[in-house]
Amino acid sequence: EQTSLVVMDVGAAEPHIHHQGRAERPAVNVSRLLLLRSYAEAVAQGQLAPERRVALADVQRYHLKARGQGGHPAAIERLRGEGAITEDSLTIAALVRSMTQYNDEAAADWLLATLGYPAVDATREALGWPARATPLPSSGRTLSWRHPRMDATPAERLTVLTAQPRSAYAQEVLDLTGAFTASGSFRDEVLTLVQERGTEISLRDQRALAQATYPTACATEYAAFLTALLQDSLGSPAVSARMRSALERTVGADTLGGPLPVEAIGSVSGAFPGLISFAAYARRPDPLPDRIVVSFIQDLPIAVFYHMMQTGMDRALFVRLLSDDAYVEDTARFLAERETGG
């Protein structure tokens, strides 16, 4: 069994569902919530100004055209359509929203570099989470699997990376990110390789390398994190409010074919072959309590993974868990029967 699922209402004594919630699993994008927390703290302390404008070219240097790196172009197109990009620049606040709402991996890498890895790692450490929970630059992580100056095969890299201490791996990824974003021969070689031949790593090897190197996450811990965020107890109320403003989106009346008892959803999610990750809360109208859903799935068969991606089955499942009380009860009953062999 390779699925963690926690469904809970804010203020409730017990969760509706707590299925393998304490398992540590590799997760896609969800660790950006730690980045968001560090950003909100930096703003509150006067270290970063949300209205400061950033050259789009500075952000695009972090974009690597490889699997798991496709969110940035679509995000930029949406930001242009919204008028958030003028004279080829945008505010830090818009970049943060692009990271959280549009899955912009280049924006996430830029923000991590701007805040500094030590600051984000300190946020993780203050929560008492394991070292592997800290996000790393996605561009450098992908290059740690394979780059033009590497002789090792993907299988050999997997052996090395599995045994490597997290601190050493983090430094390697940060160094690769720095080399890639700087002007020079290494960047030119990487861009040429990716343009001509891709990453030269099979889908099966990419899946194994991702599970070995992505940040880990615990559904129970992220559910507690989101609970604190909704209760204004994640840092100061101002920090919590800034985080929510970057996360929340209103819900259309036609979602899942009909109106939902939900006013807004704040979520971070991601997928990579074999992995699906989702951490979200729903603000619901009184007297309904706000709801939290966190799920991490790993080792999905590739055929099943792509079927879920093509049909949107995963998204529909999570939205129903956020909004449909009867569906939550049915899911809880089904999981309980499975656990007892019923």
Annotated model-derived regions:
Residues 1-147:
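Active-site-adjacent loops and short helices of periplasmic peptidoglycan-processing enzymes
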